[in-house]
C-alpha cells in the first residue's frame, strides 16, 4: 500500500509546470520535497492531494486510482495542510482542530474530544485551546492547523494506510517550533505508520528529519533518494545556483550538514 504518482505533467495556460514527475510515498516514511521557488513543489502536492488534475500521468492511493475516489473517501485516506490555510470564521481553537474529525461520522463525541486533546498536545498548542482562532498570531494559527491535520490522520481506523501532506508547514515559525513540527511529523510516520510528504526550504532540516528527498528544478525531478544521494554539491548548484559544502554532521551520526557559500 502506497501513494504513487507516475509520469505527472501539469500545464497552467501555455506553460508546463511539471514534466513527467514520478514518486512513491510509503506509510511509515517521511519524504521531503525540495526545490527553488517556482520549481513546482506546491503544484505537485496539489496533484497528489486531488486538488489539481494533471494533463497526463496517473496517481494511485493504496492501489486505487485517486480520481476514482470521492472527496469524502480521499479525506479518510489523506490529510492536507496547504501553504496558507484560509479561515475567516470566528471559531474557537478546539472547533478548528475538531474539523479533522469531519470525515469520520462514526466517531462518538467522546472519541472526538479525546482525539482533539491528543492533537492539541502533539502540536504543542494545548495552551491555546480556549482562544479564538482569529485572535492568534500567524505562527500560532499555523500550529493549530497542524493540529487539525494530525487529528484527521489519527482518526482513521487502526491499520488503514494513510498519508499527511504538508506544504511549507514551518514557514512562519521560529526555529524551536520548526523543529517541533518536523519532529512530530517524523514521529507520526514512525509510530503511527503515516506516510508524510513535506515541502521544506531548509535543506539541513530536511536532511535531519526526512528519510528520502525529491529535488525538483523547473518542474522536473533532478534527484530522488536518501539525503546523502540527493544533497550533493552538483545537485545543489544545479537547483539553487549556489556553491555548497556537504559534510557529516558533527553531532548527528548519519546526518549531513550543508553549508551554502
Swiss-Prot record:
GO-annotated cellular components: plasma membrane
Endpoints of the signal sequence: none
Family matches, as Pfam families: ABC_tran (PF00005)
Predominant location: membrane
Gene3D superfamilies given in the database record: P-loop containing nucleotide triphosphate hydrolases
Keywords, ordered alphabetically: ATP-binding, Cell inner membrane, Cell membrane, Membrane, Nucleotide-binding, Translocase, Transport
Location of the ABC transporter domain: 3-243
Membrane topology, from the record: Peripheral membrane protein
Enzyme Commission number(s): 7.6.2.-
A GO MF label: ATP hydrolysis activity
Family to which this protein belongs: Belongs to the ABC transporter superfamily. Heme (hemin) importer (TC 3.A.1.14.5) family.
Protein name (Swiss-Prot/TrEMBL): Hemin import ATP-binding protein HmuV
Amino acid at each position: 500500500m502506497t501513494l504513487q504518482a507516475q509520469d505527472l505533467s501539469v500545464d497552467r495556460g501555455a506553460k508546463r509546470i511539471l514534466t513527467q514527475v514520478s514518486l512513491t510515498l510509503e506509510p511509515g516514511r517521511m519524504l521531503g520535497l525540495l526545490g527553488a521557488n517556482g520549481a513546482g513543489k506546491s503544484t505537485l502536492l496539489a496533484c497528489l492531494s486531488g486538488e489539481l488534475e494533471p494533463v497526463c500521468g496517473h496517481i494511485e492511493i493504496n492501489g486505487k486510482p485517486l480520481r476514482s475516489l470521492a472527496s469524502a473517501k480521499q479525506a479518510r485516506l489523506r490529510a492536507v495542510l496547504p501553504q496558507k490555510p484560509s479561515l475567516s470564521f470566528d471559531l474557537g481553537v478546539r472547533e478548528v482542530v475538531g474539523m479533522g474529525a469531519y470525515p469520520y461520522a462514526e466517531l462518538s463525541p467522546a472519541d472526538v474530544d479525546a482525539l482533539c486533546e491528543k492533537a492539541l498536545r502533539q502540536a504543542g498548542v494545548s495552551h491555546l485551546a480556549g482562544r479564538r482562532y482569529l485572535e492568534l498570531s500567524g505562527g500560532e494559527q499555523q500550529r493549530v492547523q497542524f493540529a487539525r491535520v494530525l487529528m484527521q490522520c489519527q482518526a482513521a481506523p487502526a491499520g488503514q494506510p494513510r498519508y499527511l501532506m504538508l506544504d511549507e508547514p514551518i514557514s512562519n515559525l521560529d526555529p524551536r517550533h520548526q523543529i517541533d513540527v518536523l519532529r512530530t511529523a517524523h514521529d507520526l510516520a514512525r509510530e503511527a505508520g503515516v506516510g508524510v510528504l513535506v515541502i521544506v526550504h531548509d535543506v539541513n532540516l530536511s536532511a535531519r528529519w526526512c528519510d528520502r528527498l525529491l529535488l525538483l528544478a523547473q518542474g522536473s525531478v533532478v534527484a530522488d533518494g536518501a539525503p546523502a544521494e540527493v544533497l550533493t554539491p552538483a545537485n545543489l548548484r544545479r537547483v539553487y545556483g549556489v556553491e555548497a559544502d556537504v559534510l557529516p554532521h558533527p553531532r548527528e551520526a548519519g546526518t549531513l550538514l550543508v553549508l551554502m557559500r
